[in-house]
């Protein structure tokens, strides 16, 4: 637009079982996680082959080698929890509180090492600690702060500084919490007009978008707070399965 060259940012959400436990049965998630591990290795090889660096936004709990329960509860140090009316259980109800060897869908420090061992230098970003939804009105600032603090601590165990953030389900919220923890950039909401709709209309328009292969529009990074930048996502890559094979 002004003669300057653009930059393409490839950001990948690494969440395994943490990404959908509120929607999908755990046995199915764990089976999917096993397949995801295979595909992650293939993707890393491709990125190396074509010398493409990516931002890997990792759920912080995956960086743990394991965890255990205290007084019958998981992660009593990560308090308070978000108080979602649509998920009345404890957020960690499905956390196996075992180890990466026993539960590789819930812990993945090995995948972190795969990423760091590649020839291409990738960025490690945060995707929260336990995939809570910061932008949900029922997620308080104190809950977001506790979650992000836990993510920073988990990353520090691997000497990984966190400077970028990807919101779970792309629900943006509590930007002041991010900035206070040293986050400098986050992936913001897609500015495409139809992506702001909800329900059946969104699903219909999204399907047509995928079917027609409409090109994404260029976006600009925006400094939303001093030292904190919004880099909007503008193209969501989907697996070619089901009707998307068309």
What are these regions (language model features)?
Residues 1-164, 169-231, 246:
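Catalytic alpha-helical scaffold of carbohydrate-active enzymes acting on polysaccharides/glycoconjugates
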Residues 231-242:
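Positively charged, amphipathic and often flexible ligand-engagement surfaces
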């Amino acid at each position: 637009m002004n003669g300057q060259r653009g930059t393409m940012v490839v950001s990948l959400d690494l969440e395994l079982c943490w990404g959908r436990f509120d929607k999908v049965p755990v046995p199915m998630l764990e089976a999917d996680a096993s397949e995801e591990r295979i595909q992650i290795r293939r993707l890393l090889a491709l990125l190396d082959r074509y010398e493409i660096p990516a931002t890997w936004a990792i759920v912080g709990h995956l960086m743990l080698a394991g965890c255990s329960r205290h007084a019958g509860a998981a992660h009593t140090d990560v308090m308070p929890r978000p108080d979602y009316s649509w998920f009345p259980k404890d957020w960690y109800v499905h956390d196996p509180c075992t180890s990466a060897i026993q539960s590789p869908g819930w812990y993945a420090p090995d995948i972190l090492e795969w990423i760091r061992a590649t020839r291409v230098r990738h960025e490690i970003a945060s995707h929260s600690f336990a995939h809570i939804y910061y932008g949900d009105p029922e997620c308080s600032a104190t809950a977001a702060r506790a979650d992000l603090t836990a993510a920073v601590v988990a990353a520090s165990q691997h000497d990984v500084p966190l400077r970028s953030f990807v919101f779970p389900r792309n629900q943006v919220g509590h930007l002041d919490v991010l900035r206070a923890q040293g986050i400098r950039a986050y992936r913001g909401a897609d500015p495409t007009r139809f992506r702001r709709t909800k329900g059946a209309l969104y699903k219909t328009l999204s399907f047509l978008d995928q079917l027609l292969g409409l090109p994404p529009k260029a976006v600009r990074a925006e400094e939303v707070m001093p030292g904190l930048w919004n880099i909007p996502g503008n193209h969501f890559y989907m697996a070619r399965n089901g009707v998307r094979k068309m």
